[in-house]
Amino acid sequence: MGAAVNTRPVRNHIDFATLVAVITLMLLSLGVVYSASSTIAFKKFADSEEMLMSHLLRVGLGLLAMFVAIRFDYHRFRTLSKPALVGAIGLLALTLVVGVVAKGAMRWISLGPLKIQPSEFAKYALLFHLCTLISTKGEMIRDFKRGFVPMMVWIGIVTGLVVLQPNFSMASIIVLLSMVMLFIGGVRMKHLALTAAPVVPGMVGILLLEPYRVIRIREYGEAVLGRFNAGSIPYQLRQGLIAFGRGGIFGVGPGESRQRDFFLPEAHTDFVYSIIGEEYGFVGTMFFMLLFLLIMYRGYKIARYAPDAFGRNLAIAITSVITLYALVNAGVTLGLLPTTGLPMPFVSFGGSSMIFTAAAVGVLLNISSQTDLHPRATQVPVVGSVNAGKAAVGKVY
């Protein structure tokens, strides 16, 4: 007979290190985005500060979302995750009908002066609901029909709608993170392998449908095989690497970037890390990356000592999203990965990513406020994990 579980939140202090790291990234992004966007902002709006003001508003909304989420008990997402996911799916479908077309993709919905990217919300809604199912179903998660299939249906719906936008990079990230969460949650490996058999070839087929994706993969393959030369390096990557080269160890100084002046496309979004390297040098890029590594370390520590399986899974999911995005963005700008279009969390210009990721950090900090990160006694096993019991609580889909 199991002991009674006290689900009443125990309030400790939030994890200060994570909070400081995130706010530091947000504040530093103001100077970086201003420098990276000033030239293009002047060309488009005749005002070099236009995009800075927009970014400042988004940082403010992100901070507001984070502090609201800090006060919101994460256990409530057990009941809210499914309605949120259904709403996110509705927004994804709506995007395909009334979405704003930009650069050949329909990924945004216009709300007056604001544009939101529903896939950013859907990504977190899906992961949160998977965490709910994993912690609620218990041992049933290992059953193919009753546990595994319902979760794959949710993943398939979200991924399919994102692919139709089209946004292959986001769809790939959603699939990868979902599979990681299912693996951590205790899904049978043979079920994951059975799913991967058709999914991987299918994703490869979708990847090869667009010629520009084939070109990216070929160029990346040439780099891996050592056949890169100055003439074959893609223009955007070449300009990004020039920015790193100009920056050297200590950089050319804040606001002194030359690559932002119509040389480097997407300098304020996908390739903002190159501008950091140019203006602040190797030292600056390492400082930014250390902040992300600090968030990763503290996030996984929060997960380790979370008071229950749901909190543990949420912390793992949120931390994994931020870590993966930061590493992929940096890897792309350094030529280590094919171009993906994924932003650098808390730094790149972009409202939906900033607001939803900041809100997710607020959830992470709420978990930390109910977690003892410095246990002085033997840790009690997490209640609600796959190995904690055989019975599942109700039928949740």
Stretches found by the model and what they are:
Residues 2-25, 31-166, 330-345, 349, ...:
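Membrane-helix boundary/helix-loop-helix interface segments in multi-pass membrane proteins
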Residues 57-62, 279-299:
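Hydrophobic alpha-helical transmembrane segments
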Residues 64, 72, 129, 204, ...:
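Transmembrane alpha-helix boundary/anchor motif
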Residues 102, 106-108, 191-287, 306-314:
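Hydrophobic, glycine- and aromatic-enriched re-entrant/interface helices and adjoining loop segments
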Residues 172-191, 258-284, 342-357:
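Interfacial segments of multi-pass membrane proteins
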Residues 211, 286-289, 296-299, 303-311, ...:
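Membrane-proximal intracellular helices of multi-pass ion channels
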Residues 300-341, 347:
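Loop-to-helix entry and N-terminal half of a specific, functionally important transmembrane alpha helix
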